From Swiss-Prot:
Record bears the keyword Cell membrane: no
The organism's place on the tree of life at top rank: Bacteria
GO biological process, one term: cytoplasmic translation
Name of the protein in question: Large ribosomal subunit protein uL6
The family this protein is said to belong to: Belongs to the universal ribosomal protein uL6 family.
Residues with the N6-acetyllysine modification: 44
UniProt cross-references to InterPro entries, sorted A to Z: Ribosomal_uL6-like, Ribosomal_uL6-like_a/b-dom_sf, Ribosomal_uL6_a/b-dom, Ribosomal_uL6_bac-type, Ribosomal_uL6_CS
Role of this protein: This protein binds to the 23S rRNA, and is important in its secondary structure. It is located near the subunit interface in the base of the L7/L12 stalk, and near the tRNA binding site of the peptidyltransferase center.
GO CC terms: cytosolic large ribosomal subunit
A GO molecular function held by the record: rRNA binding
Source species: Escherichia fergusonii (strain ATCC 35469 / DSM 13698 / CCUG 18766 / IAM 14443 / JCM 21226 / LMG 7866 / NBRC 102419 / NCTC 12128 / CDC 0568-73)
Listed transmembrane segments: none
Gene: rplF
Complex and partners: Part of the 50S ribosomal subunit.
Length: 177
């Protein structure tokens, strides 16, 4: 059995937590995040800590409490420090540029690809083959990174495409004559 829910989440100074039934709002210097928790989870806020436990009558109470603890911990980290995700473009002529909240990609198609960023997410391109996504919501950053990667996933023979910076692409050997 996982014991993730047994550990409390420490709320640092400068972070405001509001609990309204199952709706939790966490506000910090990087913005405000809101999440609705499962009915099986009971959250208590006291002494700058959030503690989690199951409600009576739910078989999956501890599992849901562990999930809620992990989600709220990510929210606290997001509003204080924020999250970053790096993407690399590998391939001849593959380029990226950021104009406002639109990421412009040249990925070998006959047309450029423009990807609109959701609210709360910023992107920058230190080089033409690198994209850095920043924001407070870990889930949204991961989804945007997955959407950008989906335009041209790394292919298994030369490894060309959009990849995460920490991703290892396994390449196959070319067919022998």
């Amino acid at each position: 059995m996982s014991r993730v829910a047994k550990a409390p989440v420490v709320v640092p100074a400068g972070v405001d937590v509001k609990i309204n039934g199952q709706v939790i709002t966490i506000k910090g210097k990087n913005g405000e995040l809101t999440r609705t928790l499962n009915d099986a989870v009971e959250v208590k806020h006291a002494d700058n800590t959030l503690t989690f436990g199951p409600r009576d009558g739910y078989a999956d109470g501890w599992a849901q409490a562990g999930t809620a603890r992990a989600l709220l911990n990510s929210m606290v980290i997001g509003v204080t420090e924020g999250f970053t995700k790096k993407l690399q473009l590998v391939g001849v002529g593959y380029r990226a540029a950021v104009k406002g909240n639109v990421v412009n990609l040249s990925l070998g198609f006959s047309h450029p690809v423009d990807h609109q960023l959701p609210a709360g997410i910023t992107a920058e391109c230190p080089t033409q083959t690198e994209i850095v996504l920043k924001g407070a919501d870990k889930q949204v950053i991961g989804q945007v990174a997955a959407d950008l990667r989906a335009y041209r996933r790394p292919e298994p023979y030369k490894g060309k495409g959009v990849r995460y910076a920490d991703e290892v692409v396994r390449t196959k050997e070319a067919k022998k004559k």
